[in-house]
Amino acid sequence: QLSQPERILDLCTGSGCIAIALATRFVDSLVDAVDIDKGALEVAMVNVDHHDLGHQVNVIESDLFAKLPAEHQYELIVTNPPYVDAAIMADLPPEFLYEPEHALAAGQDGLDLVHRILFEAPDYLSPEGLLVCEVGDSEWALKQAYPEIQFDWLRFAHGGHGIFAITYDELMTHRQLFAAYVQLLDSNQ
């Protein structure tokens, strides 16, 4: 059971629906809704205004954590980053092609952004904090990449899969592993 977090980060917010749900659930929390896509953030701002949550939800343009104030410590970071791998991207049905590619594609294994988030999150997560991340069908790739980590995979009564939770302590314990993947990604670009 998560207590009332003071500050929540919705990373890769898109239209802001997760940030809005979090603000509605945690009425005394401040929620930062972050995305790199200006168009998505415009939609998020409309949605935040529609739900009259401008006093609680702050919409921020940033490439992951890049433009977040260093002093911000979040008790909860929730993220639904792009996680579609290269093979699935190549075979997507036409209706998915209306989405911007950067909102879906995440490299060969679907985890390019997830590796970065796992590495960078401890710098913004409070010591008692929790990171919740959706990786969808890339769950198997994450388990293969980090077999020594016991991710806490969330289960739902009705649908949903590929969502894990990991604590600040676990992120710090495995930070060198995450750093190695980020270095590998950077060297391949």
Question: What are these model-derived regions, one by one?
Answer:
Residues E61, Y98, Q144:
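Phosphate-coordinating loops and pocket residues in cytosolic domains that bind phosphorylated ligands
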Residues D28, P93-F96, I149-Q150:
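Glycine-rich, phosphate-binding/catalytic loops in enzymes
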Residues N58-I60, H102, D152:
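Structural signal for short hydrophobic segments within the conserved structured cores
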Residues E170-N188:
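Flexible, glycine-/basic-rich loop-and-beta segments that form/coincide
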Residues Q108-H174:
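Conserved Class I SAM-dependent methyltransferase catalytic core
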Residues Q1-A90:
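Conserved SAM/SAH cofactor-binding pocket of Class I
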Residues P82-L113:
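Mobile active-site "lid"/loop adjacent to the S-adenosyl-L-methionine
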